[in-house]
Amino acid sequence: MMENYKHTTVLLDEAVNGLNIRPDGIYIDGTFGRGGHSRLILSQLGEEGRLLAIDRDPQAIAVAKTIDDPRFSIIHGPFSALGEYVAERDLIGKIDGILLDLGVSSPQLDDAERGFSFMRDGPLDMRMDPTCGQSAAEWLQTAEEADIAWVLKTYGEERFAKRIARAIVERNREQPMTRTKELAEVVAAATPVKDKFKHPATRTFQAVRIWVNSELEEIEQALKSSLNVLAPGGRLSIISFHSLEDRIVKRFMRENSRGPQVPAGLPMTEEQLKKLGGRQLRALGKLMPGEEEVAENPRARSSVLRIAERTNV
């Protein structure tokens, strides 16, 4: 199934253009997926350029290993550890660009066996790396009702979080859920008001997936590490697919695009101001997919690309 899958990369040209590729530069694709961004980056690099790709999905790693290019290397692991990968290669402060395409990928969603989709029945798994960590089924079977409700409210912005959490716990007491269809049916039955444009399990599946994969913590750690690994003038090019992701990226870029916040009238010398440091990033704006891309790939509709540049400070 994996070999026959045709994956359309969202905001492909825009995200790579945002990196402002130098032929001899060193770049990181933190979310290799099926390699759309990586292949385009490689096509713009010269012989001296290098691309380090990262993914925690074993299926993505299998695809990456088919790329026979001395300029390219792949790491099986979370992109939150990019600081460690860069340090191991003695490349701190030498990275010219980092690209992140956040969230679950289309191949993951469309493969029922991965357990990400309420539209296809499969094992209730949802792990981006099925070789480690708790599956969605395991977590839902052991979590307290209050914890499930908190996850649904916080990561799914689900208004009926308490009702749904109660229904999940009650169902698991009777017979533990192991299939995506079972969870989708429990959520639908527990939802008193249906949205005619959205499946009632949409928010629950998003929330459980984010929790199981620690997705928001992964993003925050990767962003924090990026400041240390980027060279002056190095770019961040980040695609988000929902408001929780985009909020983190937007806040990070905004906060690091400011200079030191000093109260008005506070007496400080030039030397003291220098020690506080200046802004570390320059936000270069955001892009959203055009009508043509959305028509061709409806999943692109909610995507937002934000670009920033490391300053010389």
UniProtKB/Swiss-Prot annotation:
MF annotations from Gene Ontology: rRNA (cytosine-N4-)-methyltransferase activity
Keyword presence, Chaperone: no
Protein name: Ribosomal RNA small subunit methyltransferase H
Protein's job: Specifically methylates the N4 position of cytidine in position 1402 (C1402) of 16S rRNA.
Single GO biological process annotation from the record: rRNA base methylation
Organism this protein belongs to: Shigella dysenteriae serotype 1 (strain Sd197)
HAMAP family linked: 16SrRNA_methyltr_H
Top EC group: transferase
Main location: cytoplasm
Any one Gene Ontology cellular component term annotated for this protein: cytoplasm
Gene designation per UniProt: rsmH
Organism lineage string: Bacteria, Pseudomonadati, Pseudomonadota, Gammaproteobacteria, Enterobacterales
A Pfam family the protein falls into: Methyltransf_5
Compartment(s): Cytoplasm
EC numbers on record: 2.1.1.199
Bilayer-crossing regions: none
Gene3D superfamilies reported in the protein's UniProt record: Putative methyltransferase TM0872, insert domain, Vaccinia Virus protein VP39
Keywords tagged on the record: Cytoplasm, Methyltransferase, rRNA processing, S-adenosyl-L-methionine, Transferase
